Amino acid sequence: MIKEKAIAFGIGMVDNKVIDDINILQATKKAMTMAVDELNRMLETNGSRQTDYILFDAMKIDDIKIPQESVIKGDAKVLAIAAASIIAKVTRDRIMAEYAAEYPGYSFEKNKGYGTKQHYEGIKKQGICPIHRKTFLKKVL
């Protein structure tokens, strides 16, 4: 429903290899930059002007040359940030459901890739699969 009501939105994604290469924080910033780029493309397609100010949840991104504000606990204070968080979570959950079919035995459909007991049991039983982050697994294995 959020997507249908929004004037525009953008989704940015990076894979596990990028996260392993540049770390989770930098990968998050990269994905957020991609999301802003997609947002601006969608706005342009809709005939709207580009984004001129961005609110982020507890983060600033130097690569984005648009005025921005970091809002601590932004998803609890700003409706647009909360909506973006929901879009991100639903998108990730759908991707993990697809991975559950592709890589059975890790309970991705339930744990969404988070470090749950069932997920760790799947790793111990089957080893890692191509979507696992090696940097995270160093802490676990």
Predicted feature locations:
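RNase H-like, Mg2+-dependent phosphodiesterase core
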Residues: 1-141
